[in-house]
Design a protein with these regions (language model features):
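Solvent-exposed soluble domains appended to multi-pass membrane proteins
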Residues: 1-163
Length: 163
């Protein structure tokens, strides 16, 4: 935490606009339903849903120069992030590009931003809808979008030059 504080303090002093994205890693597996965490009092949640194990804390921060250049409050509001802040890590980069005004440059990232507005959290066992509902059932349209996302992800990784 001290290292992050030192980094932010240094970036605050810069006249150049800077946006910092910092994120951690999900919790390791410690028994069915993460029983060890509950027994240790590590989680404040009464129930452990299928997404909790994969939560990754993240921070998106801007120095004053970036906040002014981007109209930060309006830019953050336009992201339409869920109230609970949950967002799949695979959507974080696209959200940052949108936050910094770089929409329309890539059909891939535009697709990711469209998908994250509908399904901000995608995990193999569960999904979180935009209203915060956690489900393992998708509509046909949502399932088709997830299939497209997975296929496009594969081809983007393997072939790099696909639109």
């Amino acid at each position: 935490l001290q290292a992050l504080t030192t980094l932010v303090q240094g970036l605050e002093e810069m006249e150049e606009p800077v946006v910092l994205v910092f994120f951690g890693d999900h919790l390791p597996y410690l028994g069915d339903n993460q029983l060890a965490y509950a027994e240790l009092g590590f989680t404040a949640r009464a129930e452990w849903d299928a997404l909790t194990s994969y939560e990754t804390p993240y921070v998106i921060w801007a120095n004053d120069a970036a906040a002014q250049a981007l109209d930060w409050e309006a830019a953050v509001a336009s992201l339409d992030l869920p109230e609970d802040g949950r967002l799949s890590a695979s959507f974080l980069g696209a959200a940052v590009l949108e936050l910094t005004g770089r929409t329309g440059e890539s059909p891939w990232f535009d697709f990711l931003n469209q998908l994250r507005r509908e399904l901000p959290v995608v995990q193999k066992q569960a999904y979180q809808l935009a209203d915060g509902t956690v489900t393992d059932q998708l509509t046909e349209e949502q399932a088709a979008k997830i299939a497209k996302w997975r296929q496009w992800s594969y081809y983007k990784l393997m072939y790099k030059e696909i639109d």
